[in-house]
């Protein structure tokens, strides 16, 4: 299996992010997504470390990961794995669940990340084939089709409840303060001692309560913020070297390595495919 990846934004659903990739040796570092991650495994076997357990997703399976929940991914077999992913917004899936249940509800909750639903897998694979075309000739038709498939995914496999069965533990009041501090100073360099002084908590306790609330330790959340900013700023013509420094990375090499570990493609590839 040849390692290759293409990431782009489709015009449907207000720039839906799409990733088609094949990997053998590449592994995704532990990270989170702002939106839902809905993927299909088209070849090989993927391993996903999620909610404290390692799950395997073979060819023909669907993988759904909740927004904000930390996870890492890698090839479960030597031959690697190929997958297609879309990242529908939380609001979109929530609206679909409201339509399905006809009552106000929380964010859809998927109890298991790996789903076996062959008919839905085949339908999603067909939708991805249409998404991969250089130009989408009938955006309305494709958007309607994808909405139908996502509604089917939610109705068959999400928990229909007003409250998610997986609620985070009590959130220490300083967690939001540290999150806000990192969000407004993401380009700066910090040590855990810096954040400890900022919060008034010991480094160990801060790391524990932050991970429990956010799904990532503070340093990984800082990387998440930088990657999110990079995705936005790659739409501009700023040089990658300057962008790396502006975002707080040591240099372009550090930026490139980190971006690929989180997104699956290099910053240069991501920028080039934004224009497709």
Please give the residue ranges for each predicted region.
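N-terminal regulatory/effector-sensing and dimerization cores
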Residues: 2-106, 133-136
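Amphipathic, well-ordered alpha-helical segments in soluble domains
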Residues: 37-40, 89-92, 123, 145, ...
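Extended, non-catalytic scaffold segments that flank or surround catalytic motifs
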Residues: 44-45, 117, 273
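Residue-level signal for well-ordered alpha-helical positions
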Residues: 51, 76, 96-100, 156, ...
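Short, Lys/Arg-enriched, Trp-marked, Pro/Gly-tolerant hinge/linker segments that flank
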Residues: 105-121, 131-199, 212-220, 224
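Short, Lys/Arg-enriched alpha-helical recognition elements, typified by the DNA-recognition helix
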Residues: 124-128
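Terminal helix-turn-helix DNA-binding modules in bacterial transcription factors
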Residues: 176, 180-184, 188-193, 201, ...
């Amino acid at each position: 299996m040849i390692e290759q990846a293409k990431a782009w934004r489709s015009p449907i659903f207000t720039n839906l992010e799409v990733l088609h990739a094949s990997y053998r040796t590449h592994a995704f570092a532990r990270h989170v997504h702002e939106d839902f991650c809905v993927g299909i495994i088209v070849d090989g076997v993927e391993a996903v470390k999620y909610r404290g357990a390692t799950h395997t997703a073979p060819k023909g399976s669907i993988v759904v990961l909740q927004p904000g929940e930390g996870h890492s991914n890698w090839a479960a077999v030597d031959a690697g794995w190929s997958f297609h992913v879309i990242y529908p917004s939380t609001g979109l899936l929530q609206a679909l669940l409201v339509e399905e249940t006809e009552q106000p509800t929380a964010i859809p909750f998927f109890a298991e990340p790996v789903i076996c639903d062959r008919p839905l897998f085949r339908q999603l694979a067909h939708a991805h084939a249409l998404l991969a075309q250089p130009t989408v000739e009938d955006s309305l038709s494709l958007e309607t089709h994808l909405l139908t498939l996502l509604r089917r995914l939610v109705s068959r496999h999400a928990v229909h409840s007003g409250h998610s069965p997986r609620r985070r533990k009590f959130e220490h009041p300083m967690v939001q303060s540290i999150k806000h501090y990192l969000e407004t100073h993401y380009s700066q360099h910090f040590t855990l001692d810096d954040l400890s002084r900022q919060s008034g908590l010991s480094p160990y306790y801060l790391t524990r309560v932050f991970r429990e609330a956010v799904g990532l330790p503070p340093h990984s959340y800082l990387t998440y913020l930088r990657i999110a900013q990079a995705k936005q700023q790659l739409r501009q013509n700023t040089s990658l070297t300057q962008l790396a420094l502006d975002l707080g990375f040591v240099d372009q090499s550090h930026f490139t390595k980190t971006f690929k570990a989180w997104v699956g493609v290099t910053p240069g590839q991501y920028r080039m495919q934004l224009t497709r």
